């Protein structure tokens, strides 16, 4: 499936940021408590989130296996030119670091709700950005 097709399909696109994945794996929240119907949603994350999670120093084999198992249930969105250009625009205009700019751009391009508990992302006002606090 092409990335652009995800933005026009029926249903809700949900993009997990790194904190949202970590806290979900730590069982600090569950999707049903957010009122999210998984059956009617596409669960997505950026390739940057995958890289951040799996490049953690001193990651144990069990942690790595849990992360990979969770990510196997998501659509991991690669970096394409449209996301790249939007991330550059966001990075130039905000105090966000590049990884967060890429995650936000992914969410915007896919017309998705960004799941996070990062106040930098939740308080960001940007055209097309939709966020939901996981707590």
Please provide the spans of the model-predicted regions.
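Acidic, PIN/NYN-like endoribonuclease modules and their adjacent C-terminal/linker elements
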Residues: 1-13, 73, 108-135
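Short, well-structured N-terminal submotif of metal-dependent ribonuclease cores
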Residues: 1-45, 55-68
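Short beta-strand scaffold positions
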Residues: 16, 45, 78, 98, ...
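Active-site phosphate/pyrophosphate-handling residues
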Residues: 19, 82, 101-102
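A generic structural signal for short hydrophobic patches within well-formed alpha-helices
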Residues: 21-22, 50-53, 84, 121-122
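Acidic, metal-associated active-site segment
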Residues: 53, 98-113
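Acidic catalytic patch
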Residues: 73-93
């Amino acid at each position: 499936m092409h990335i652009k097709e995800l933005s026009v399909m029926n249903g809700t696109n949900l993009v997990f940021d790194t904190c949202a994945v970590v806290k979900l794996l730590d069982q600090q929240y569950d999707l049903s408590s957010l009122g999210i119907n998984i059956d009617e949603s596409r669960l997505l994350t950026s390739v940057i989130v995958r890289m951040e999670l799996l490049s953690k120093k001193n990651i144990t084999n069990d942690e790595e296996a849990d992360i990979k198992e969770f990510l196997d249930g998501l659509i991991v969105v690669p970096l394409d030119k449209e996301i790249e250009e939007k991330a550059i625009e966001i990075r130039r205009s905000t105090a966000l670091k590049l990884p967060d700019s890429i995650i936000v751009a992914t969410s915007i391009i896919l017309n998705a709700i960004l799941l996070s508990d990062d106040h930098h992302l939740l308080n960001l006002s940007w055209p097309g950005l939709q966020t939901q606090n996981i707590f």
